[in-house]
Amino acid sequence: MSKNKDISVVSPNAALVEASGVPALLDQIRPAWKAKSLISRVQRLVSVDPSSACQRLLNAAIHDLKEKVVIAGLDIAGEAAKKHKLPSVDNAEDIENYSTAKIIDLAYRMGLLSRPEWRRVARCYEIRRDLEHEDDEYEAGVEDCVYIFKTCIEVILQKDPIHLLKVTDVKEIVE
């Protein structure tokens, strides 16, 4: 076989995923994330392997969520973690080491995700865990892929980070 020829096997679900509006959803991602190679990889994969594309998109959303937790404030993250018996947060590295399930919980406990958003993102993670095992017990359908795309983009990747005021900032202004 020649090295110059690319072979791509298109998933039978790829056309359905594209027809369901996923490419239009990808246009809603914030420019800061659209510029990243991970999102361009997702755009290329959608038409070939939607299951892998949605796994990568969820990875991007979780990374974005971690960044948003740090931007919102490590002091708030630390308090929320302590109050809700999550792993302690003292610095940004602690957030990087948080598991996916725990970062979803922490973002909810900090108020970065509403309860319905938290449930949707947690469900996406559950679907992705099922996909990772790639066993015969569960196979992602078109609806699962579309759900992950829609949730990750609408709940996380299209929203700008929230900059919260800190008590120390207010004290400095008052003084």
Go through the PLM ranges and name each one.
Residues 2-123, 138, 161-175:
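Amphipathic alpha-helical interface elements
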